[in-house]
């Protein structure tokens, strides 16, 4: 089947490692083809991303086709809403995009400037293009009480994204 129809999910996150080795335990709920991304910065080096295909025995989950934009989410008591590009018409590839993200908790706006630093930043956004599995990692800035994502999509496509931030040690 088409690689672009496989579901893309965050299955687990490793921890900071100082000894050059890493460990991550992940439970796969279904068999099938998965991609693992290791995003790291060696001491004195530049950011690197290693991508590895993992084939898990068992019955694969039903493939999911992403055909509709989803620019909002409710997770752990927070509501997030992403603006559809700078002019509200969508995103473009090949040019710098500024994408504001509004965050609420209990219906009230949350200023991301109040977030704790997590791995040295107020937030991390990881996006993966569904068909090519292109990996994008960016650190949104805090502007006007919102997170502002500054990124360039190299190619047109459907991207799935995960935003990480920390409040109250979580």
What spans do the regions from the language model cover?
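N-terminal soluble domains immediately following signal/targeting peptides that reside
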Residues: 1-170
């Amino acid at each position: 089947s088409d690689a672009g129809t496989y579901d893309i999910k965050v299955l687990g996150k490793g921890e900071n490692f100082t000894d050059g080795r890493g460990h991550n335990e992940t439970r796969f709920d279904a068999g099938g083809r998965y991609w693992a991304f290791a995003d790291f910065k060696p001491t004195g080096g530049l950011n690197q991303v290693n991508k590895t295909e993992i084939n898990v025995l068992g019955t694969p989950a039903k493939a999911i086709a992403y055909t509709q934009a989803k620019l909002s989410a409710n997770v752990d008591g927070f509501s997030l809403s992403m603006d559809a590009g700078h002019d509200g018409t969508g995103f473009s590839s090949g040019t710098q995009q500024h994408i504001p993200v509004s965050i609420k908790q209990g219906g009230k706006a949350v200023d991301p400037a109040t977030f704790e630093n997590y791995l040295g930043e107020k937030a991390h956004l990881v996006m993966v293009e569904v068909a090519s599995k292109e990996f994008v990692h960016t650190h949104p800035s805090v502007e006007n009480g919102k997170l502002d994502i500054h990124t360039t999509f190299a190619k047109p496509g459907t991207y799935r994204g995960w935003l990480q931030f920390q409040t109250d040690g979580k």
